């Protein structure tokens, strides 16, 4: 529950201090080789470099490779279930639940038959663009 309030608080502060409109760079969809999609919602184009936010959809029965980020990554599950594995410790996140990972920890995401949709937040915010740069931009 505390993690949910942390995510909501970060986003609320950024929106209150920088405005809430999307920049023309947002809303673009990116797809990973495994089929996960990322749609940028907020980034340096409107909130500055402090934070970025995206909607991510993990396809059914997906399993991302273990990886690390250069920023704090927080997830809020909107639908489905996401197995959030940090340094080998697994937690099942269901709708309404949140999880996070800090650098240099290793993270892996797995889904079941329903897949999962999450809102992801990165602090500092440049991390979302780094992820998107490695994925394919959808038309």
Label the predicted regions.
Residues 1-7:
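Bacterial N-terminal signal peptides that target proteins for export
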Residues 5, 13-50, 130-139:
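A short, N-terminal "cap"/entry segment at the start of jelly-roll beta-barrel domains
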Residues 48, 103-128:
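Ligand-binding loop in jelly-roll beta-barrel domains
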